[in-house]
Amino acid sequence: MDNFFRGGTLGIVFTEGELWQHQRRFALSVLRNFGMGRNLMEQKILDEIVAFTETLSKDANETSCDLPWRFEVCVGSIINAMLFGYRFEGEKLNEFKFFKSLLSDHMHSMVNPCIAILAQELDLLKYVFRGSYKLLDRNRKLFFDFFNRQIEEHEKELDLNSSDEPTDFVEAYLREIYLAEKNGGGNETYFTKKQLANMCLDLWFAGMETSANTLEFTVLYLIRNPKVMKKVHEELDRVIGTSRLITLKDKCNLPYLQATINESQRMANLLPLNLLHKTTRDVTILGHFIPKNTCIVPQIGNVLFNETIFPEPEMFKPERFLNENGELKKIEEFCPFSIGKRQCLGESLAKMELFLILANLFNQFEIFPKDPKHLPTLRRVPGITWQPTHYNVKIEKRHV
């Protein structure tokens, strides 16, 4: 499948060994340089949130607001600016709408177990599921045309003699390719334009789907649990009290909101099947011998819905993440970003996005179901990640 879709085992999600180590180390370094966990990245997210809330203000008091779409544009612009240096606005919105639709088609097609299995045997897929094969092939070409076009445009403008810091991921990677080719030592095999295109694929896919879906699930859960929504608003009114922009400095003073986000991540359990791993040595678990190099799938959902760890796991209860003093408490088993050396590369970015977007959304707006007599369903749309069934809402400004 990798040979068909990627042109080899490339990118960061499905690679291993030295190639994976080099890519992860480089990506983490770039994210740190971009200010991940510091106010540089925070400011970029806040700039996008200002545009997001200004758009929502125009939707206020209308009969219907497509909030999930607003989330997708906001998150998509953050990811795109980090990767390619521009946000989605004006005519670029049509570009985003096209590729987001393409991404959804791809995510949903790959959840079909027959297609997922036959994708490993492309000759069978090509002739047994011709339509699915053509869809995958079309998606592959369109995505890589887009990523390669971004790389080519960056190459035209790249000044390798400039001492300025790179402004986006593609620029940083192209500089690394140049240095690897210049210095030799074997690194030139790890940093190539083909590998860069696949890194863009992994980061764009992962950054888009997970954060946007979590935001959509959070609003869905709160619409269906108005008492939780009321407590979130009460905390925001007590701590913030105005429509000012909420920043990361406010985070420690908003434990109930943080607990609500944690509970949303737990309930959403975005990955129905986690990424494949393999054992690096022989191991025995609960009496079962598993030899080295066995493919395994760690199921985080089994932990997130474990009744011993999370009593009444089907209930939406943010209080489970608070201690008796109302302070946020750490639950070791809560691991929505996975654990270990292959845990989510963008965890810091995702946490920052979720808090800043939701804090400012709930502080500035009241959110209601479009039809109070028919609440949005909890039925999920299957895919590589779970997605809520699309819903619209009504919103009102909280501070006039």
Map each language-model feature to its residues.
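Cytochrome P450 heme-thiolate monooxygenase catalytic core
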Residues: M1-F4, E18-L19, R38-L215, K231, ...
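Cytochrome P450 heme-thiolate "Cys pocket" and heme-binding signature region
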Residues: G8, L201, A206, L286, ...
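Conserved cytochrome P450 K-helix E-x-x-R motif and the immediately C-terminal K′/meander segment
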Residues: D145, E152-E153, L245-G287, E307, ...
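C-terminal helix/juxtamembrane-tail motif
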Residues: A172-R175, T294-C295, E366, P382-V400
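Short, small-residue alpha-helix embedded
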Residues: S211-L222, I357
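Cytochrome P450 heme-binding "Cys pocket" and the immediately downstream C-terminal segment
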Residues: P226-V228, S348-I384
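Hydrophobic, well-ordered secondary-structure elements that form the walls
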Residues: V232, S264, I290-N293, F316, ...
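Conserved cytochrome P450 K-helix/beta-meander segment immediately N-terminal to the heme-binding cysteine loop
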Residues: P298-G326
